[in-house]
Amino acid sequence: MHELSIACEIFEQVMSTAKEHGATEVKHVTLQMGRLSHTNPEQLSFCFNVLADESIAKDADLIVEMIPPSLECECGYKGAVDEKKIRENCEFESELLAYAAVMECPVCGKPAQLTGGRELIIKSIEIETENQD
C-alpha cells in the first residue's frame, strides 16, 4: 500500500506550508490525481486523516480531483484519451491496462504518447491564521 508513503509526503508538505504561513488550522487540501497514478483516493484520504489526527490538519477536508489521461501525437493532436472507447473495449482488470490498450490517436489512429494522467499535485491548501476574522 503505497498510499501511506504518498500521504506522508502530502502531510509533510501541507504542514510545512501551514507553518510557513502561520496557520492555526488547515481547513482544506485539494489534490489533482491522475487516473493512471495507481493511487486509491479513499485509501489516501484515510492515511492522510490518520497522520493529521493530532495536528492542526485534524479536521481538514482532503479533496481529490481526478485527472483523465491525455495524449499527444506526431500528427499534432493533443487531448484526452477517449474514455468512451475504453469503457466499450475494457476487458482488463487493471485500469492502466485498459488505457494502455487504446493509446492511439483519435485523429489519425497511430500510437500516441501518454502526456498526462499519472500526476499527483497539491493544487491548494486552505488555512486559517490567528489574524483572520
UniProtKB/Swiss-Prot annotation:
Keyword NADP: no
Binding positions (Ni(2+)): H2
Keyword Zinc: yes
Superkingdom of this protein's organism: Archaea
GO BP terms, alphabetized: protein maturation; protein modification process
Residues spanning the signal sequence: none
Record GO terms (molecular function): nickel cation binding; zinc ion binding
Ligand binding (Zn(2+)): C73, C75, C105, C108
Pfam families referenced in this protein's UniProt entry, alphabetically: HypA
PROSITE patterns, A to Z: HYPA (PS01249)
PANTHER family: HYDROGENASE MATURATION FACTOR HYPA
Assigned protein family: Belongs to the HypA/HybF family.
Function: Involved in the maturation of [NiFe] hydrogenases. Required for nickel insertion into the metal center of the hydrogenase.
Designated name of the protein: Hydrogenase maturation factor HypA
Species per Swiss-Prot/TrEMBL record: Methanosarcina barkeri (strain Fusaro / DSM 804)
Lineage: Archaea, Methanobacteriati, Methanobacteriota, Stenosarchaea group, Methanomicrobia
